[in-house]
Regions:
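Acidic catalytic motifs of isoprenoid enzymes
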Residues: 1-164, 168-183, 190, 194-229
């Protein structure tokens, strides 16, 4: 359930584009510093959005730096360094690890399985640093998996579990902002789950996998047909 939150560059001012890129590059640098180069392949725009949100809510003052990297080896580019970038880098590892395991379970994706093993050490380090969050995320994913395993066709139940997961990630502290950030993450997580189901629908039908929308539609068709029997 990652890769759905992106920006539309055509609607951004130059200063906003620059800031977005600085947050994205800052996340990449934080992953490299905290979890080694291999972790940078987990980089995604969803987490960049979370950095921007938390920076705005907490009015975080970030340090702006310059560097070259393997993607930009010739010219230096700016990136930002700060508390929430490091927090989001850790959460990115947490979610990416579970997402890779999900890809392995659903598609038997060998690359996903191998990559999960490569970042497992970082995953354990994050779990040790944020035990409560790691446990809550695991609980939400277990709830989600149980719903899908039992073929429960009500998509709202699975969306609620997804909402719990995002709500946990979006609230870094137990403070005055926690409730609103958690509620925001919860609502966004529910939306993303349904969106993800729509995106995967054709593929799930082709491979005969469980899809909450496919099962719901088929159930409704069967129900309607029974009226005419």
């Amino acid at each position: 359930m990652v890769g759905n939150i992106v920006t539309n560059p055509k609607l951004l001012e130059d200063t906003d584009k620059r800031y977005y890129r600085e947050c994205y590059c800052g996340l990449c640098k934080s992953l490299q510093r905290k979890h080694k180069n291999i972790s940078r392949f987990t980089l995604n725009y969803d987490m960049t959005f979370l950095i921007i949100l938390l920076n705005e809510v907490y009015k975080e003052k970030n340090e702006k730096l310059e560097c070259r990297c393997m993607m930009h080896p010739v010219h230096k580019h700016t990136y930002i360094k700060g508390t929430f970038i490091d927090y989001v880098a850790d959460m990115n590892i947490l979610l990416s690890y579970y997402n890779l395991l999900d890809d392995w379970q659903d598609d038997k994706n060998v690359f996903a399985n191998c990559y999960a093993k490569l970042i497992k050490k970082s995953f354990k380090k994050v779990c040790k640093k944020y035990p409560k969050k790691a446990q809550n995320v695991q609980n939400a994913l277990k709830e989600l998996n149980d719903i899908e395993t039992k073929n429960i066709i009500n998509p709202d139940l699975a969306a609620q579990a997804s909402g719990k997961l995002f709500g946990e990630i979006f609230a870094p502290y137990e403070d005055e902002y926690e409730e609103k950030l958690r509620d925001f993450g919860d609502a966004l997580g529910k939306f993303i789950y349904i969106l993800d189901a729509c995106i995967d629908l054709e593929k799930d039908i082709k491979h005969k996998r469980f899809d909450r929308l496919k099962e719901l539609v088929e159930s409704q068709i069967a129900k309607n047909n029974s009226k005419y029997v």
